[in-house]
Amino acid sequence: MTVFIETQNFGTITRIIGPVLDITFTGNKMPKIYHALSIIDKNSEGLDIFIVCEVQQLLGDHCVRAISMNATDGLKRGMTVFDTGDVLKVPVGRSTLGRIFNVLGETIDNLGPADTSNQLPIHRSAPKFIDLDTKLSIFETGIKVVDLLAPYRRGGKIGLFGGAGVGKTVLIMELINNIAKTHGGVSVFGGVGERTREGNDLYMEMKESGIINEALISESKVALVYGQMNEPPGARMRVGLTALTMAEYFRDVSSQDVLLFIDNIFRFLQAGSEVSALLGRLPSAVGYQPTLASEMGALQERITSTKDGSITSIQAVYIPADDLTDPAPATTFAHLDATTVLSRGLASKGIYPAVDPLESTSTMLQPWIVGEEHYKCSQNVKQTLQRYKELQDIIAILGLDELSPDDRLIVARARKIERFLSQPFFVAELFTGLPGKYVSLAKTIQGFNLILSGDLDALSEQAFYLVGDIEEAISKGFLKK
């Protein structure tokens, strides 16, 4: 963040309560709400202090209450605080690709500072209604299970549910890779209140898979913005807005389709709850901030399609105590167009991506949006898999031979479908030894229709495992023994 200090407008710290600072200004010119304030001083050991905070409340008597974006270690009453005269601004544009930033837009990857000639404020209005693109269109990902059973909306918001070790990171990286290759777009990853280790692992894996191009950093496909778990609540509350601002530039100025990943959207609301309590607001239900819905709405309404481009957002959602009625996830669900649920059961079978075909949903899966053929195919696939699920208890007790011929046929086709929903990923080529596959929606529908019709009953289920389109499964030629 570039700091422009208005030297005439400064105040002094009068109270420090953790990350909350009360600052009294002497002149008549008071900072406005959301203005960035900077503290440049030395601590008791003579080390430099540089802290940025954001005005949250105007208390009267020339006093403001601000929330710090940095740790407040070393601060003391009486220190001078400067009003920068504007809200937080962060660098945007191609110079952000391949780099890691913090909430202030400062690079934290030890590769030197980024170009700050292009900057935008993190607090911006949502696009005007007249600028929105209201046309319903599918955002093709090239991943069979997603495109067929829970398609993403262009400019929509998708909730990604999954525990540790079920392939969430690999799915995120494949989506970043596919949007770059197919749509010519870029991605922005916002790590909100995540573990530092996970953020580091993601960065290293992106470098290994080529999503971040170390040789030519500007040719990378993703920008990373991190506000880790150990950061003050102010930083965790604003890091999502920093990532969103970078994505908005690619949509509005570069006219691109952008993928915005937020991991984890619950941590954004949790940080808001901490800040609200520190500011002395009365809590709402379950201790959350009274402004829960408006904070979420302000973020989500900026994630949309315009006539220039789109931001399609994939948000990891943590469910506290597995309680879907908790105000944080319940507020999030109201904004989602689709849910992608990752299943540990499928991951244990080696079926990747481990997307649960029966639990994942999408508002786009309607015949007047996706077309009659796509809709019928998806419903038939779900019915077959649902029937297979119902029969599994009987199979476990009595065995497959005790089923009727019709049910045995359903089980055989369901097992083929389950395996055909798997797919080799480009970003996992190093681990699987298989070349990655991008499958168009038309090829996906054709393949599942052939399985459902019985035309491929002669092939063994192994022919459908980790393949791209149906021609590849047929060419494998594993006939039943």
Curated annotation (Swiss-Prot):
Which InterPro entries does this chain map to?
Answer: AAA+_ATPase, ATP-synt_VA_C, ATP_synth_F1_bsu, ATPase_a/bsu_AS, ATPase_alpha/beta_chains, ATPase_F1/V1/A1_a/bsu_N, ATPase_F1/V1/A1_a/bsu_N_sf, ATPase_F1/V1/A1_a/bsu_nucl-bd
One of the record's GO cellular component terms: mitochondrion
Could you give a single Gene Ontology term from the biological process aspect?
proton motive force-driven mitochondrial ATP synthesis
The way it spans or sits in the membrane comes to: Peripheral membrane protein
Supply the Gene3D superfamilies for this chain.
Answer: 2.40.10.170, Bovine Mitochondrial F1-atpase, Atp Synthase Beta Chain, Chain D, domain 3 (1.10.1140.10), P-loop containing nucleotide triphosphate hydrolases (3.40.50.300)
Compartments, record wording: Plastid membrane
- Pfam families referenced in this protein's UniProt entry, alphabetically: ATP-synt_ab (PF00006), ATP-synt_ab_N (PF02874), ATP-synt_VA_C (PF22919)
Any one Gene Ontology MF annotation carried by this entry is: ATP hydrolysis activity
**EC code(s) of this entry:** 7.1.2.2
Function (record text)? Produces ATP from ADP in the presence of a proton gradient across the membrane. The catalytic sites are hosted primarily by the beta subunits.
Q: Which family does it belong to?
A: Belongs to the ATPase alpha/beta chains family.
Q: What is this protein called?
A: ATP synthase subunit beta, plastid
Q: Which organism is it from?
A: Prototheca wickerhamii
